[in-house]
Amino acid sequence: MSLNPVIFSIGPVSIYWYSLAYVLGIVFAYWYLHRLDDQKIFTKNFYDSLLTATIVGIILGGRLGYVLIYDPVLYISNPIEILKTWEGGMSFHGGAIGVLLAVIISCRRHNIPIFYALDLVSCGVPIGLFLGRIGNFINGELFGRVTTMPWGMVFPESGDNLLHHPSQLYEALFEGLLLFAVANSLFFLTRIRLYHGALTGIAVMWYGIARFFVEFFREPDYQIGYLWLDLTMGQLLSIPMVLLGMLVYLGALNLKFNTKSVT
């Protein structure tokens, strides 16, 4: 399977599907926040501040996370490669930290309840994750392990001409579409949003569990391979995510972050 990662080129400038995925994900989240904020707590200045901070957080956090966690040697020897974000190489965990900091900073600047904002962000972010994984699929990167299943695909970057799991699509489903469905079903059909932070905790737990599971089908990063107990880096990073999500969820229920505390 080989798809052209470039949408079109104008002279030396090329527009990539991967980059478009990020743009569409951010635009959707920005639009969706407006619809979810039924209490009208967010101001225009807050939206503008959050949008700017989120873009910076995703790019810097995602790229630096990948550089530091997955391939520091390559980027130390070729630092110019750090700037080539359109070629892929973004860490979800780094990007998540970047988005978290963006939300915290924007909320503090505009006196917005942090966990109220994080719950709403958790409802929109999964679509960005879905689009990002589709971008990975088009790039032919982050493919799965060798398989005999009929839906296996040949990825040129594997260099072996064997069938591999299209693990990018698995992640797009479990970390993207299903998380979006679960988070929004809970938001609209239950009273969980009365406990600010509970939905954030569930979303973080869901992602960690989904990522841990899908990693069993995903080819480990060639420069890292298998680590402790034959787990991948993605799985090891997902374990603290699940624990953190559980703590946030239980804390939200115990501390009763409900709408009465919103001022």
From Swiss-Prot:
One of its GO terms (biological process) is lipoprotein biosynthetic process. GO terms for molecular function: phosphatidylglycerol-prolipoprotein diacylglyceryl transferase activity. Pfam families: LGT (PF01790). Its main location: membrane. Keywords: Cell membrane, Membrane, Transferase, Transmembrane, Transmembrane helix. A 1,2-diacyl-sn-glycero-3-phospho-(1'-sn-glycerol) binds at R133. Its EC number is 2.5.1.145. The keyword Transmembrane helix applies. It is a multi-pass membrane protein. It is found in: Cell membrane. It comes from the Bacteria. Pathway: Protein modification; lipoprotein biosynthesis (diacylglyceryl transfer). The chain crosses the membrane at residues 6-26, 50-70, 85-105, 112-132, 169-189, 197-217, 233-253. One of its GO terms (cellular component) is plasma membrane. Belongs to the Lgt family. Catalyzes the transfer of the diacylglyceryl group from phosphatidylglycerol to the sulfhydryl group of the N-terminal cysteine of a prolipoprotein, the first step in the formation of mature lipoproteins. This is Phosphatidylglycerol--prolipoprotein diacylglyceryl transferase. It comes from Wolbachia sp. subsp. Drosophila simulans (strain wRi).
